[in-house]
């Protein structure tokens, strides 16, 4: 959902530009304050804060050891997306109370993420606790597949190392060489892909399905009464 939201905005830019749409700024690749502000708020309030909260509440409880590490891996993934968009952002003190939250340097954020992901990958206990219903890497029993989480953490670390190679080649090379010594702990096939597993009810299904299918079906009676066939195709909008 996090990346999908930004991709939707970028694709909207392209489609509006290609179609010659008028009105607003999006087809001119302009910045829209409302879109940018809402995305920033959603990043912190609805994407990062929940997984950060898991860590602060459960980090000292050994029964939640793996689940805290999984939350930390996902938090670092979300921050990796945010820093790639905005550069320096609040991270180390992002969730401290107060109105004046300092921004971390972009380079410091990358170094912290690289260290965090290594600690998480190394710290996962393959025979330890799991989420009973894992929405990202479910096993056959729907609980967390810990090996896939380990591979994801290592692969994300590899991606971040490649991303900083022009800024700090020495650090990037160090991380890449280390990871390539154990390629079996990296994502190696489509089976390892990081995909959100959607459900089949209103609480768990893809929101685009609701938008494009459910909303359309709920408007069918109104479309028939309007007598305009073109509205059938415009229903989701």
Regions found by a protein language model. Give the residues of each.
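Extreme N-terminal leader/anchor segments
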Residues: 1-24, 56
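Structured, solvent-exposed acidic/aromatic patches
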Residues: 18-74, 78-237
């Amino acid at each position: 959902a996090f990346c999908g939201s930004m991709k939707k905005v970028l694709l909207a830019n392209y489609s509006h530009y290609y179609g010659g749409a008028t009105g607003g700024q999006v087809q001119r690749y302009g910045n829209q304050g409302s879109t940018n502000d809402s995305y920033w708020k959603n990043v912190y309030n609805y994407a990062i804060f929940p997984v950060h909260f898991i860590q602060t509440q459960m980090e000292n409880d050994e029964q939640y050891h793996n689940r805290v590490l999984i939350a930390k891996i996902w938090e670092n993934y979300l921050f990796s997306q945010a820093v790639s968009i905005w550069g320096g952002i609040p991270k180390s003190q992002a969730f401290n109370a107060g109105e004046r939250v300092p921004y971390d340097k972009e380079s410091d954020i990358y170094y912290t993420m690289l260290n965090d992901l290594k600690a998480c990958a190394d710290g996962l206990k393959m025979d330890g606790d799991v989420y009973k219903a894992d929405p990202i890497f479910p096993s056959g029993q729907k609980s967390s597949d810990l090996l896939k989480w380990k591979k994801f953490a290592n692969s994300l670390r590899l991606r971040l190392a490649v991303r900083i190679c022009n800024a700090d080649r020495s650090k990037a090379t160090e991380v890449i060489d280390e990871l390539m010594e154990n390629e079996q702990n990296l994502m190696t096939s489509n089976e390892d892909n990081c995909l959100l597993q959607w459900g089949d009810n209103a609480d768990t299904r893809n929101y685009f399905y609701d938008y494009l299918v459910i909303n359309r079906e709920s408007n069918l009676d109104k479309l028939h009464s309007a007598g305009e066939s073109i509205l059938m195709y415009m229903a989701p909008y």
